[in-house]
Amino acid sequence: MKQLYDKFSSDVSVKLTKAYSTSFSLGILCLDTEIRRHIYAIYGFVRLADEIVDSFHDYDKEVLLKRFEQETWTALDEKISLNPVLQSFQETVNQYKIDRDLIKQFLHSMEMDLKPKVYTNTTYREYIFGSAEVVGLMCLKVFVSGDDQAYHELKPYAIKLGSAFQKVNFLRDIKDDFGVLGRSYFPNIQNQDLDHASKTAIIDDIANEMNVALHGIQRLPASSGYGVYLAYKYYLALLNKLKKTSVSKILNERIRVNNFEKSLIFVESYLKFRFLRYR
């Protein structure tokens, strides 16, 4: 019967991830079956924590996040949880021996979101490390099947990819982050302060990180390479759309990659991965 609960828990993480991110879900679907559920487990955990600080406005978020953090450590220690998302997450963390410091840094970044602030260069880097880079490192542990040598060799590239993805999210979501949640992640830039020069600097920084990250993606095992490459190509397409979009439009609407464009990315990415090895 425990196996039935484990499957149920895994299914919950899958549904949670798919409900909130169709793009990531598509990338995960292109991973080998053996590792797919573990990446869903990581993203289910991340999504639930993020939801606490982003959506539960009528409740005491600080209390809820603290409780979630305590339940996380209990689940990891006892290797069981009555929360299905934490159950599937603890199974993945314990199986792949994911460093708990990564989880601690992630939860710290969620705490940073509890109080609106304008970020400095230092707090910006701190937030990106905890909210995105460590998530990439958790996934990397799964991608390399816990191989420490491969993990350390690919770690710098995973960090760059996580950072680039998060910065694209920041630029895409700048309207809602500032207007609804009172957050401004880019250092010393509030919503109305974004101009063409600052937008260009942000995009150039992201493009440089994406270029570095690609070298790491090319070295991933076949079991994960295509799925990660697909996510990379999606974010690259979104970055290019943001680059071509005026600042005023970015500040007033959420820029998206439409379904037709996603279909083209899917086909192109598969052909490049299968026959051209990413060229």
What are these regions (language model features)?
Residues 1-167, 171-279:
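Catalytic cores of Mg2+-dependent Asp-rich isoprenoid enzymes
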